[in-house]
Amino acid sequence: MPSLLTHSILSVAFAVGLAAPVAAEKLKVVTTFTVLADMARNVAGDAAEVVSVTKPGAEIHGYQPTPRDIVRASDADLILWNGMNLELWFEQFLGNLRDLPSATLTDGIEPISIVEGSYQGLPNPHAWMGLDNALIYIGNIADAMAAHDPDNAVTYRENAEAYKTQMRETIEPLRAALSELPEDKRWLVTCEGAFSYLAKDLGLKELYLWPMNADQVGTPQQVRKVIDGVRDNDIKAVFCESTVSDAPAKQVARETGAAYGGVLYVDSLSTADGPVPTYLELLTVTSETIVNALTKDE
């Protein structure tokens, strides 16, 4: 027969169990690609869970979502996407989900227009590559999270301000290094025209093989145009981004005598053990690669 002490212990345990607070579920956020996911994690801190639809290294423009992507996203409280025609697959993807709230992170950004190809006249979607724009992204992320999780609104806004400070401290030394380069050397030659915002921020003129990865890429006409541009302007280095073939850029380098300056990162982060596992490292590695190639032998 149970003792009085046993009854007392069980009664206390039951009462404590009833009184114990139930941990609130964290806000679940899904982003369309890894760059946005890293930004969102910096804003979220420990207050929200953030995942990306695409994996590190993925080409974002023509991505084809899988049924698994849809299942994972269906559990989200909030979806963050870029807009500006970057995720051409997103509207159909969102249509496969229940009525999920989403936020377009380029809201409030002044776009740079694409000037050639099938997407001529449309906004260049790679707005996160500009410093001032990146600050707008961070603010939009904090606003969206705060709206859907007001209990943690202060946390999101404080984290966002701290992250903005880190970003300014990252980019300013790189901008200063490029400011020493003579005007006629300030060219950025790439495969995709994905660096218009960064080029504007760093005071560089831009030349590229194709305007968007979703367009035709690496055609003989595109290669010839850039070869002529490199020769006419005595450009010293050409680059290519990580998610496409560098063969056309290396052909330009061979035929002009320009150096192949290396890989630039824009559409995707790397895995944790790679060169750009975070957005700040993406900015740093990409900008340093440009600076090092253009200032070599100066």
Please report, for each region that a protein language model flagged, where it lies by residue:
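Bacterial N-terminal signal peptides
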Residues: 3-17
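Extracytoplasmic metal-acquisition and chelation regions
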Residues: 24-298
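N-terminal signal peptide c-region/cleavage motif recognized by signal peptidases
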Residues: 19-21
